[in-house]
Amino acid sequence: MDRSRVLEQLIPELTRLLSLLDHEYLSDSTLEKKMAVASLLQSLQPLPAKEVSFLYVNTADLHSGPSFVESLFEEFDCDLGDLRDMSDDGERSKEASPEPIKSPSLRSTADVPPPLPNKPPPEDYYEEALPLGPGKSPEYISSHNGCSPAQSIVDGYYEDADSSYPTTRMNGESKSSYNDSDAMSSSYESYDEEEEEEKGRQPKHQWPSEEASMHLVRDCRICAFLLRKKRFGQWAKQLTVIKEEQLLCYKSSKDRQPHLRLPLDVCTVVYVPKDSRHKRHELRFSQGATEVLVLALQSREQAEEWLKVIREVSRPIGGAESLEVPRSPVILCKLDQDKRLSQEKQNSDSDSLGMNDSSSTLSRREACEHGKGKKNSLAELKDSMSRAAGRKITRIISFSKKKALSEDLQTFSSEDEAPCCGYLNVLVNHGWKERWCRLRCNTLYFHKDRTDLHTHVNAIALRGCEVAPGFGPRHPFAFRILRNRQEVAILEASCSEDMGRWLGLLLVEMGSKVTPEALHYDYVDVETLTSIVSAGRNSFLYAQSCQDQWPEPRIYDEVPYEKVQDEEPQRPTGAQVKRHASSCSEKSHRADPQVKVKRHASSANQYKYGKNRAEEDARRYLVEKERLEKEKETIRTELTALRQEKKELKEAIRNNPGAKLKALEEAVATLDAQCRAKEEQRIDLELKLVAVKERLQQSLAGGPALGLSVSSKSKSQETTNKPQSSVPEQSLPVNCVSEMRKRSPSIVTSNQGRVLQKAKEWEMKKT
């Protein structure tokens, strides 16, 4: 096919290809190539097809021969004398006799150009000639938009002009065609304008890597990598995009979610030009009186371009140009802003300081900028301060200057009361970091500080996990959280009691049936082991008792709820409560820990010791005390009857020493056994009664101060509706206080000794 015809078909095809590429998202290198081809096509289209012979088209296939431009100069040979004989009016001499061409065998290897390629190049292959600068060699940039055969030409290769260009003979003297200014001037004279156009068409925004996410800038109005101002005057380069009436900031072009999302329809934008005070062109975004974002731009033109886009975004859709009213507040001029700030500085509070970089006001920023002494000291502080120290100083200043909100105070108070949170050392990247840990809904949350509970660093779902104490002899109070025998987290407590407390809480939250006593402890001595196990058992029992009621702690014993009766037993009056309270022994300050008291379902609704809780406890203990006293009177009556019968049998044995003596003795032995059993029942009732009286006294001690009032009901309903206290001891769980009391057997011994002594004295009086 004729070469000119191919070029005629190639130009419109390239034009259509470029129009299709205008609607595609291209990388920077591809965009540069496209603009270069477009400029070449624009310069070629007005010319007729026969005048496009100066276009550089490299027909070499896989670098197997010279380019098309080189082949043009291969047979260009003339004598200098023929050039002198040319007339001034432009007539050329027709009798130019070129020097005969040397045979290939006589030519040197360096003078012989490589042969022309036999097969045409691929359709998507082209070569672009860039303009020559002073002291530079011609630069050829080749590109493949599609698939190419093996050993394809790599993008951006360079050809050495001195070695690759063919030689030109003038007057019998061999010269390189590259140095022939007359021959090359016609080919390079028009590239100065194209060079300026290429500089103007270069893309402004450079992506840092090829794998950068291009979908971030899809359908956006404008995008660029801008500097965003952080706290303490630090700057960070972020990808800034305006899309769908929002300004989005990404920390990296690979991010999927924006780091900051700012609606422009509710913001005020102020442009601060670069001057002696401001080292950069800045755009300041504010919401109300709070400055939320500061961006730095490279030039005034770039700032005006961004302001133009922001005005277009804030402009109402479909409004007339003369009647347009922006939805966002008007973009203020810097001079007007300075006047307004000078008035606001007098009323600004000097103690106000935000918790983060988006909470400082415009007036505070301008006031700080005017204070040169503060600015210099802050600049020195920035140079010597690390990021961690900066965050700590911010928290300290904010804590001392800013008033805490009421809900934050309530959160802190509840966190202090509950044992399900505290500081732990966490192993992160082979280093220990202190974190505020919190248990909630079977999940362990890690916070940077106890004041920052709204965001957490990490969270671990505890269901299905295991806990294993020990992490080497250097960390005796460390323990590990395992899931499927894989370490999920390594934590370290500050002391043995803290370690035991966390172990008990974690075991309950994990739903494990293992108790703290069953765990295997290494690297601790016997004393420390006892402390860990004791604290672990206490927290384990506590967490079991109030597993579903975080974070309110319980005070009294936790027992299973009884069935709520349809008819509540009558409660005694307030006068009866006072009478019974005064009759309680003041010497009994300690109760038997083995005595368990049933908790009615109605009293389980209150979790803190308030007015309702005191009233419910007083009623329950009073009813229990009266029931025990009634049962005690019944046993005492039965015991008196048995002793009377025993006394009569002994008198009968004394009076009748005959044949019935053996039967009478057996009857007396049977009565003795019955009396001993009744006496044991009476002693148990005495112990229970002492414990109930003590707890009644404790509830009444807190009740009157809270306005306690106890209603009364009849004793007949009390006897019919109140169940018997025949619940076995094993079915009633107790809290950690009762378990601690179990460790002092002297309490039980002293109570039993007094009761037995009183019972013996009472028996001696009766007999």
From Swiss-Prot:
Residues 610-700 form a coiled coil. The modification Phosphoserine is found at S87, S93, S97, S103, S152, S328, S342, S746. The modification Phosphotyrosine is found at Y556. Gene3D superfamilies: Pleckstrin-homology domain (PH domain)/Phosphotyrosine-binding domain (PTB) (2.30.29.30). Residues 164-173, 349-362, 709-733 have a biased composition (Polar residues). InterPro entries: AFAP, PH-like_dom_sf, PH_domain. Residues 174-189 have a biased composition (Low complexity). Pfam families: PH. GO terms for cellular component: anchoring junction; cell projection; cytosol; podosome. May be involved in podosome and invadosome formation. Interacts with CTTN. This is Actin filament-associated protein 1-like 1. The lineage of its organism: Eukaryota, Metazoa, Chordata, Craniata, Vertebrata. The gene is Afap1l1.
